[in-house]
Amino acid sequence: MCELKELERELQPRQHLWYFEYYTGNNVGLFMKMNRVIYSGQSDIQRIDIFENPDLGVVFALDGITMTTEKDEFMYHEMLAHVPMFLHPNPKKVLIIGGGDGGTLREVLKHDSVEKAILCEVDGLVIEAARKYLKQTSCGFDDPRAEIVIANGAEYVRKFKNEFDVIIIDSTDPTAGQGGHLFTEEFYQACYDALKEDGVFSAETEDPFYDIGWFKLAYKRISKVFPITKVYLGFMTTYPSGMWSYTFASKGIDPIKDFDPEKVRKFNKELKYYNEEVHVASFALPNFVKKELGLM
């Protein structure tokens, strides 16, 4: 494993160092100016880069794919975490697979009902880097309710049966690192088995525009396992297309019929993106998405 070392480098005003991320087919992409390189290293699994952008703040990337930026990470983390958390009647035990930056854990821990939240991250160096450089998202690491496990999530979840109220999959891109292991039908079945009867599940399932293949495959596989499977969407400005998909699933809870907006209105923790109106609206899908999923 690569040791975590200081790699800060101030760039001179005339130095134009840019970060490029290419989307599907390498014909479209994202580029960001780097005014400070904070960390760059290679673990046994993936390349880790952390740098500063004048407008977006600290940017975190794995294998050349943007994971978080300080300015917009709340959009992704709130939608991934709070949709399932508010749908469960009393979430006490939560498993997060992936999400080594800590943002999803931070949001889960905003719920006072939570007694234990396990964050299972495959790459220990990501946890070290997040703890040191991603203060905004890793602030929940030392919460007494949090437990950090370094393990392959696809293998770890198989240890449990009827154990969790909520399982959240905060995976990397399926083509990077070991992210593909978290997109298999066998993995989704293991998550189903690890949930209690009233348990709920959510997963990031890529963008429904450039990554349409992975998006459709995830929905197809999840819906084979869970009797209730619904896609919902949210904005994510630095992810491909700006439109991001998530998939909610459960053994019996419906994300619209069983949603209680009053629980959200009474919530006394800060939410910058998610609210009761956004919850309902996020499940309204554009026609092109419905068509790809065979829903029209």
Curated annotation (Swiss-Prot):
Pathway(s) the chain acts in: Amine and polyamine biosynthesis; spermidine biosynthesis; spermidine from putrescine: step 1/1
Gene3D superfamilies: Spermidine synthase, tetramerisation domain (2.30.140.10), Vaccinia Virus protein VP39 (3.40.50.150)
Keyword flag Kinase: no
Subcellular location, record wording: Cytoplasm
Binding of S-methyl-5'-thioadenosine, residues: 46, 121, 152-153
Highest taxon of the lineage: Bacteria
Top EC category: transferase
GO cellular component: cytosol
Reaction equation(s) it catalyzes: S-adenosyl 3-(methylsulfanyl)propylamine + putrescine = S-methyl-5'-thioadenosine + spermidine + H(+)
Residue span, PABS domain: 16-251
List of residues binding spermidine: 77, 101, 170-173
Subunit structure: Homodimer or homotetramer.
The family this protein is said to belong to: Belongs to the spermidine/spermine synthase family.
Record-linked NCBIfam families: MFS_SpdSyn, PRK00811.1, speE
Function: Catalyzes the irreversible transfer of a propylamine group from the amino donor S-adenosylmethioninamine (decarboxy-AdoMet) to putrescine (1,4-diaminobutane) to yield spermidine.
Stated name of the protein: Polyamine aminopropyltransferase
Gene encoding the protein: speE
